[in-house]
Amino acid sequence: MSDNSQKKVIVGMSGGVDSSVSAYLLQQQGYHVEGLFMKNWEEDDDTEYCSAATDLADAQAVCDKLGIELHTVNFAAEYWDNVFELFLEEYKAGRTPNPDILCNKEIKFKAFLEFAAEDLGADYIATGHYVRRHDVDGKSRLLRGMDGNKDQSYFLYTLSHEQIAQSLFPVGELEKPQVRKIAEELELATAKKKDSTGICFIGERKFTDFLARYLPAQPGPILSVDDNKPMGQHQGLMYHTLGQRKGLGIGGVKDGGEDPWYVVDKDVANNILYVAQGHEHPRLMSHGLIAQQLHWVDRQPLTAELRCTVKTRYRQADIPCTVTPLGDDRITVRFDEPVAAVTPGQSAVFYLDDVCLGGGIIEERLQE
């Protein structure tokens, strides 16, 4: 076993079970471990929704139990400028961004990585993400986590091989039940804490209520895509995403049959929300997509056609596809089979077996 005791690792302690067990596992591997709690959002009047105080207390309790120092840092300004404002801009444009991907890119593997290295003298950072790192020929690769249900590589595709080389992912080799078991055996404060859901800055509150504070409601018509028949009113296109079924306010429609209604398109210029019946309606299906803002983990641009698999959203089954470079940092992706609810603003992430190659932002879906 290599001597890790000279190596300092700063673990991003979120107050959750995964980062808690990560800190313990790194201790067991002999590293000098310290924790860092990041505050990325300034609560104003939302204390009942914001769990930051509880999370910090839980992180502190775990660090006390493990006998490690816990540092704190406030990245709220960086988060607002580099994550939240972009998130709002995308919603205003009628797209559906993924703030967790942005947060990993701008905060956890940029602001945190720089702070840990420069201010705390870290050799590595570590997080509780369910991914694995594999070094080949001097380059670090990003692999899916061993737990297929929890794999989080989709959210980390923007990382470069250099960033991965500076990062450790201890729970990526484990399955979630094993992680909980370790926490319970150690009697860590976070052992039974449920996984956080929802977007980090929104917490458990209703998404539409949160968005309404920053983006004014813009009501407009809901039309049936098949015959332009009025189906109701929406309160704002930003509250709806392609493939959405709930929250449309369309009940039983005369002569409408039993199939539920789905969002199939948004006309941003005219503020129209288009819906159709059935989850396999042709307007919901795509044969491919065009992606931009590409990030390849090895940082080598794609120069030739590539056969691989793609995910257009988290937890989706892998879709076999062919990727073709278009130049100007864009690619065309053609699926072997049509895919439902491919959503502009979301990320398309590419894989070869367990290796995450990288990805990009979906610019448009191809329906032919």
Curated annotation (Swiss-Prot):
Its EC number is 2.8.1.13. GO terms for molecular function: ATP binding; tRNA binding; tRNA-uridine 2-sulfurtransferase activity. Residues 98-100 are annotated as: Interaction with target base in tRNA. Catalyzes the 2-thiolation of uridine at the wobble position (U34) of tRNA(Lys), tRNA(Glu) and tRNA(Gln), leading to the formation of s(2)U34, the first step of tRNA-mnm(5)s(2)U34 synthesis. Sulfur is provided by IscS, via a sulfur-relay system. Binds ATP and its substrate tRNAs. It is found in: Cytoplasm. The keyword Cytoplasm applies. HAMAP family: tRNA_thiouridyl_MnmA (MF_00144). This is tRNA-specific 2-thiouridylase MnmA. Residues 150-152, 313-314 are annotated as: Interaction with tRNA. It is an enzyme of class 2 (transferase). It comes from Pectobacterium carotovorum subsp. carotovorum (strain PC1). GO terms for biological process: tRNA wobble position uridine thiolation. One of its GO terms (cellular component) is cytoplasm. Belongs to the MnmA/TRMU family.
